[in-house]
UniProtKB/Swiss-Prot annotation:
It comes from the Bacteria. Forms part of the ribosomal stalk, playing a central role in the interaction of the ribosome with GTP-bound translation factors. The lineage of its organism: Bacteria, Pseudomonadati, Pseudomonadota, Gammaproteobacteria, Aeromonadales. NCBIfam families: PRK00099.1-1. CDD domains: Ribosomal_L10 (cd05797). Pfam families: Ribosomal_L10 (PF00466). InterPro entries: Ribosomal_uL10, Ribosomal_uL10-like_sf, Ribosomal_uL10_bac, Ribosomal_uL10_bac_type, Ribosomal_uL10_CS_bac. The gene is rplJ. GO terms for cellular component: large ribosomal subunit. This is Large ribosomal subunit protein uL10. Keywords: Ribonucleoprotein, Ribosomal protein, RNA-binding, rRNA-binding. GO terms for molecular function: large ribosomal subunit rRNA binding; structural constituent of ribosome. Belongs to the universal ribosomal protein uL10 family. It comes from Tolumonas auensis (strain DSM 9187 / NBRC 110442 / TA 4). GO terms for biological process: translation.
């Protein structure tokens, strides 16, 4: 079905609006994936706060012009499924990576984060970013370990000092 000019403008506006508020983006090729699996992927994307859409490459190129995702233009070849992470930078990459494990025909083309292009082979960099809660938990664990270690060292120094005074 051919799209009219107004439809194309609406698609470009919708995708560029999604790109403006996004933290990261990932592009993939979903040729050969069944409709049922794609529906499940779309549902998972909604739950994860990821905007996902299949868009014509020319329209997608126009939509990302002037955004942090302009560096992805070279991967917009063939059918392109684009996903923008709105809540967490690694959400779309994690979602696509998990989906690709169970679907041989699904292939990740690449991603972008803060204006930097991430090739498909390195998408794990983006997928393994900790969530805000995970990062805070790691920080707190590190702080607790550091303070416990400091306490142990202080107590050991105090013990050594008392032993030196007693001798």
């Amino acid at each position: 079905m051919a799209l009219g000019l107004e439809d194309k403008k609406a698609i470009v506006a919708e995708v560029s609006e999604a790109a403006k508020g996004a933290l990261s983006a990932v592009a993939a090729d979903s040729r050969g994936v069944t409709v049922a699996k794609m529906t499940a992927l779309r549902q998972s994307a909604r739950e994860a706060g990821v905007y996902m859409r299949v868009v014509r490459n020319t329209l997608l190129t126009r939509a990302v012009e002037g955004s942090d995702f302009e560096c992805m233009k070279d991967v917009f070849v063939g059918p392109t499924l684009i996903a923008f992470s709105n809540e967490h930078p690694g959400a779309a990459a994690r979602l696509f990576k998990e989906f690709a494990k169970g679907n041989d025909k699904f292939s990740i083309k690449g991603g972008a984060f803060q204006g930097e292009f991430i090739p498909a082979a390195q998408i794990d960099r983006l997928a393994t970013l900790p969530t805000y809660e995970e990062a805070i938990a790691k920080l707190m664990a590190t702080m607790k370990e550091a303070s416990a270690g400091k306490l142990v060292r202080t107590l050991a120094a105090l013990r050594d000092k008392k032993e030196a005074e007693a001798a």
